[in-house]
Amino acid sequence: PNGCGKSTLLKSLTRLIAPVSGVTLLDGKSLHSQPTKQVARQVGLLPQGPVAPDGIRVIDLVSRGRYPHQSLLRPWSPEDERAVSAAMDATGVRELSGRFVDELSGGQRQRVWMAVALAQNTPILLLDEPTTYLDVRHQLELLELCRELNLRDGYTLVAVLHDLNQAARYADNIIALKEGEVVAVGPPADVITESLVREVFGVEARVITDPESGSPLMIPRWGSGVTAGVGT
């Protein structure tokens, strides 16, 4: 649910904030003791509500995803060009390359930011509500892309999703949080249960098996413990 610590958790996994207690490890070493560029070559982040610099074009923003791989001794290279090109193709934003980011729709911007994360070409990718602003088609395309990155290319992906049915369909494992605490961890069938939906979200629901995917499918029981308001 909202405010349970999902975004805070992702930020702590990318050095944006330091944990108050405990330690975050990357390859067995403290994440916060490693050089920033070294971490950025291993872990990519699509944050919630990113803001692009004024007057920047799509191609230039996506190219910034290659910054962790560059240095004085290694300027822009054909490898960078290939990574940017592949990221734009994968997210369907190549036709937007010459446009200014601030003139795009919310859904187009979200796909551009996904391209930035992909151009970074990290083995670990953290996505904070990646389907925000996207219509149903582009939501499914993005989630299918994530699945492909995992199965074909070996990426490790961690995504914050509010749609339980999408999470159940695409995730190998789900972590349910409530008020900053981990409530459940495991495969979708073990986590997406009627009792957990009631405990975490305060929603009475029926959970059945999706006949298409075989994953759990949550169907809210409106009128049974939930009050739905309609604005006027």
Q: Where in this protein do the model-derived segments appear?
A:
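Helix-to-loop junction immediately C-terminal to a conserved catalytic motif
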Residues: T14
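Conserved ABC ATPase signature
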Residues: P75, F100-L104, Q108
